[in-house]
From Swiss-Prot:
Pfam (any one): RecA_C
Recorded superkingdom: Bacteria
Gene3D superfamilies: P-loop containing nucleotide triphosphate hydrolases
Family: Belongs to the RecA family.
NCBIfam families: tigrfam_recA
Gene Ontology BP, a term: DNA recombination
Protein name from the UniProt record: Protein RecA
Primary role: Can catalyze the hydrolysis of ATP in the presence of single-stranded DNA, the ATP-dependent uptake of single-stranded DNA by duplex DNA, and the ATP-dependent hybridization of homologous single-stranded DNAs. It interacts with LexA causing its activation and leading to its autocatalytic cleavage.
Gene Ontology MF term list: ATP binding; ATP hydrolysis activity; ATP-dependent DNA damage sensor activity; damaged DNA binding; single-stranded DNA binding
Length: 318
C-alpha cells in the first residue's frame, strides 16, 4: 500500500471504512432556486457540468454567474472562449472581476482542450468554463476543404479529452463547466428529436446536466427587458435529479435576485400575497410583482433578511 501511495500519491488507494464521506464542496450558481434544485447548494467541485439549451436561452449568463460567485469566495477562474464572443462588459455587470479572469481564445478544439487540461492540472484555478462544445472544431476540419466529410471527428476529440479531464478535475477539485448547443436529429418521428453536439461522451462524464430554456418575455411597456427562464436538472450524481428552478434573466443585468426573493418568498409563505399586493410582516412591498421586485431591489437590508429566511425554509424542505 505504501509503495502504491508513493508512486501515485496519497489517497490513490484506501479502505472504504477509512475515509469519512465529507459534505460536497460547491460553487454557488448565482440563483437561490437553482442552488436548491441542485440539492447541494451549487455546482459540485471536482466534477464536470454541462449546461445546454437553445440559442439565447441564458447558458453563458449562467456560467458567468458561477465565475462571479467563485471569485467572490476568493477563487480563481478561467474562460475558454472557443466561440470568440466573450463580452467583458456584460461579465463585469454580472459581478465578474474581469481583470483577474484568465481567458483563452483558441484556434481549434485540440488547443482549447489542451489548454483546459493544463490549467486544471496546475491546481491554480477553481472553476473553468468552456464556451462552447459546438465551437470546438477539430484541427483536421479547419485545415481541410469546405466540402470534406469529417464525420465523428469532434465526438472522438471530446471522448479522448473527457477521459483525461475527469480524473484531473477530481484530483484538483476544479469545477469544469461545458456550455453546449442543441441540434435536431433528422428523421426522428417519435420521441425527442433534440440532441446536444459533440457526441455522447459529455452526457456520460458530466456529473450534472442542466437544460435551460427561456419561457415568457418580460416587458416594460412595449420594450422587452428580460425573460423568464426555466432550468431542469436532467442529470445529477450528487443529489436527486429532475428538480426544476425558475428565475428571471434581465438583459444587461443577469439573474434577477429580487425576483427570486419575491417568487420563493411567496411560494414558501414568507411573503404574503393578498390580491395583487405583496407584503412581509406589516410592510407592504408593492402592488404587483414588478413593484414588489423594485422595493426589494431598493432595500438591500430587507433583501438580505428575506434571503436568510428563504435559505432556512429551503433547508427544512430538503
Amino acid at each position: 500500500m505504501d509503495k502504491i501511495e508513493k508512486s501515485f500519491g496519497k489517497g490513490s488507494i484506501m479502505k472504504m471504512g477509512e475515509e469519512v464521506v465529507e459534505q460536497v464542496e460547491v460553487i454557488p450558481t448565482g440563483s437561490i432556486a437553482l442552488n436548491a434544485a441542485l440539492g447541494v447548494g451549487g455546482y459540485p467541485r471536482g466534477r464536470i457540468i454541462e449546461i445546454y439549451g437553445p440559442e439565447s436561452s441564458g447558458k453563458t449568463t449562467l456560467a458567468i454567474h458561477a465565475i462571479a460567485e467563485a471569485q467572490k469566495a476568493g477563487g480563481i477562474a478561467a474562460f475558454i472562449d472557443a466561440e470568440h464572443a466573450f463580452d467583458r462588459f456584460y461579465a463585469a455587470k454580472l459581478g465578474v472581476d474581469v481583470d483577474n479572469l484568465f481567458i483563452s481564445q483558441p484556434d481549434n478544439g485540440e488547443q482549447a482542450l489542451e489548454i483546459a487540461e493544463q490549467l486544471i492540472r496546475s491546481s491554480a484555478i477553481d472553476i473553468i468554463v468552456v464556451d462552447s462544445v459546438a465551437a470546438l472544431t477539430p484541427k483536421a476540419e479547419i485545415e481541410g476543404d469546405m466540402g470534406d466529410n469529417k464525420v465523428g471527428l469532434q465526438a472522438r476529440l471530446m471522448s479522448q479529452a473527457l477521459r483525461k479531464l475527469t480524473s484531473a478535475v477530481s484530483k484538483t477539485r476544479t469545477t469544469c463547466i461545458f456550455i453546449n448547443q442543441l441540434r435536431e436529429k433528422i428523421g426522428v418521428m417519435f420521441g425527442n428529436p433534440e440532441t446536444t453536439t459533440g457526441g455522447n461522451a459529455l452526457k456520460f462524464y458530466a456529473s450534472v446536466r442542466l437544460d435551460i430554456r427561456g419561457s415568457q418575455q418580460i416587458k416594460d411597456g412595449e420594450e422587452v427587458i428580460g425573460k423568464q427562464t426555466k432550468v431542469k436538472v436532467v442529470k445529477n450524481k450528487v443529489a436527486p435529479p429532475f428538480r426544476k428552478a425558475e428565475f428571471d434573466i434581465m438583459f444587461g443585468e443577469g439573474i434577477s435576485h429580487s425576483g427570486e426573493i419575491i417568487d420563493l418568498g411567496a411560494d414558501l409563505g414568507i411573503i404574503k400575497k393578498s390580491g395583487s399586493w405583496y407584503s412581509y410582516n406589516d410592510t407592504k412591498l408593492g402592488q404587483g410583482r414588478d413593484a414588489a421586485k423594485q422595493c426589494i431591489a431598493d432595500n438591500p437590508e430587507l433583501a438580505e433578511e428575506l434571503e436568510g429566511l428563504i435559505f432556512e425554509k429551503l433547508r427544512e424542505h430538503k
